[in-house]
Amino acid sequence: MFRLITLKIQNFGQFLSNMIMPNISIFITWGIMNSLFLSLDWQYNKIFAQLISPIIFYLLPILIGYTGGSLIAGQRGGLLGSITTIGMITSTDMPMFLGGMVAGPLGGWIIKGFDQIIKNRIKSGFEMLVNNFSIAIIGIFLTIFSFFFIGPFIEGVSKFLGCLIKIIIDFNLLPLIAFIIEPAKVFFLNNAINHGIFSPLGIQEISENKSSLFFLIESNPGPGLGILIACFFFGKEKSYKSSGTAAIVQFLGGIHEIYFSYVLIKPILMISLILGSMTSIFMLVFFKGGLIAAVSPGSILSILAMTKKGLYFANLISIFSSFLISFLSAMLFFKINLGQKIKNDKSSIQLFKNNLFPIKKIGDEKYDFIKKIKNFQKIKNIIIACDAGMGSSAMGASILRKKIKSNNLTHIYVSNIAINLLPKNADLVITHEKLTYLAKKRAPDAQHISLTNFLDSNFYTSLVKQLDLNKDFFKKNNIQDKKDRITQINIDSHKEIQSKCFFQISDKNIFLNQYAENKKEAIKIVGKHLVAQGYVKKDYIDAMLDREKIASTWLGESVALPHGTIKSKDSILKTGVIFCQFPKGVHFGETIDDIAYLVIGIAAKNNEHIMVVSNITNALDDKDVISKLSKTKSVKEVLSYLNVNVKKN
């Protein structure tokens, strides 16, 4: 439930952010003009100053309304969102940014619903007439509605928030919002907070004060920088070695997400973030600091560019003090080694993390959750599903099938499949934790297991052990004939796959000593090789990147298996596998330790790749082999470990 609520909040926050982010350059344009041409600033110019007001009162709200509508219903939604926003703009005398964020999606939803109602009901030749007049007529009603109702309502909400903020500031309580901001940021809600909440509030305030501290509350790089520097100097784990580079990227590049995983590794550092943020806000209030416009990304360079003349000291002291407090408190936690008992006890630290951040992890020494599965005796059909059914699920199925066979559990059939093709009569479905929700909708009567590591051999061993304990049930119930039939199905399926296996991995499919800064770059490298060898069309690379956004293709054990979405099958020309070695590693998973040294790209037509994946899986079942494959400089050695003959092309 917690994961579902978090996902809903993230999706809503992302939607709000998506209305602001495409227009952030216009915000910056307005901010620079505001700084340059208004009185008491750098270069007052009475003529140019006339350009500023229309941007904040008309252009920006309409752009937000258009963007919000287009996110729902494309261009038609954007047009209706724009005209709806006009109604609110003319009904008030304040910038209608919040109004645009309401009017845009409202217009989009209404025109989307209208289009669905009239779909396939318009006579040929009348499409353009209906499309144009529908926007005009609906737009008139929405404009009037927004003028009389939505505009005044948003104005009232804005005034209420303004009074509330004034009370908070008057009572010196503003620093306390750090208790909300910093934990929310670590859950990747930073853009939602900055662009969905603080940017509209900041613009509301800037019309009176010429600058606003709300623009700097979330975007301040100080607290995160303090965490990263403390990790670099005092963190003992290997995962902290990269924090020095991360600090440069975060401070100069403004990519705050880079420090979130370091906090999740050691949750006590959340206190350091909160203390740093509280210090920053206190300094901003005390010295009356702030920015003239929203900044994105939250880089020190962007912040300096958006700083009004006369506020450099206030803003810089705010950033520095937040860095100092965050760094010193984090150093203290590292020095006194708070929670030493938890650190030394692996099971306790997992429990500690799960209590603070209840994300279900598979990979503990004990798999007690497997025992919660009911009616092991009735499990005859196990399906491992992923979004496309060609990569991670194929590897997982290969490992489980091998263990099922070695334990002579011939009554159980193991298969892998795309999640949208899940049959409703499945007995047991195994999926990545981010896809389990979809799997339960497709197969509500099946039992479900979530995991994060498809190569976790211990998990499959524990599952098979429980299945093995219940195998006598079949003997007692005289269903040997069914066992024989299922066994024959397994044999026939295996022979069919072998007979159709036209693809064989060779030296042209192996690429050693590759380098990538991040997983996006690594996926592009793999995809480029798939395209170059004629396996896929060029748009398959975009499909691979889209697939990575759904859930990470990190398998565990230093291996990633990127592939396209189920919708991208038409972009596959023929089955192909690309094996790329990244000796320096690429961060692929959700935690800082999820580093892939082997990235295997797959494009599959039908089941032609299954035998190749099976061979790869057998090799990757041995950690020593994975280590050697990660370091070897010989293509022949790679092929030998993959149990195939060297075949030159």
Swiss-Prot record:
Superkingdom of the source species: Bacteria
Task of the protein: The phosphoenolpyruvate-dependent sugar phosphotransferase system (sugar PTS), a major carbohydrate active transport system, catalyzes the phosphorylation of incoming sugar substrates concomitantly with their translocation across the cell membrane. This system is involved in D-mannitol transport.
Protein's gene: mtlA
Gene Ontology CC entries for this record: plasma membrane
Protein name: PTS system mannitol-specific EIICBA component
Induction line: Induced by mannitol. Repressed by MltR.
Organism listed in the record: Buchnera aphidicola subsp. Schizaphis graminum (strain Sg)
Pfam families: PTS_EIIA_2, PTS_EIIC, PTS_IIB
Domain PTS EIIC type-2: 12-340
Subunit (UniProt): Homodimer.
Cell membrane found in the keyword field: yes
Topology of the protein relative to the lipid bilayer: Multi-pass membrane protein
Domain notes: The EIIC type-2 domain forms the PTS system translocation channel and contains the specific substrate-binding site. The PTS EIIB type-2 domain is phosphorylated by phospho-EIIA on a cysteinyl residue. Then, it transfers the phosphoryl group to the sugar substrate concomitantly with the sugar uptake processed by the PTS EIIC type-2 domain.
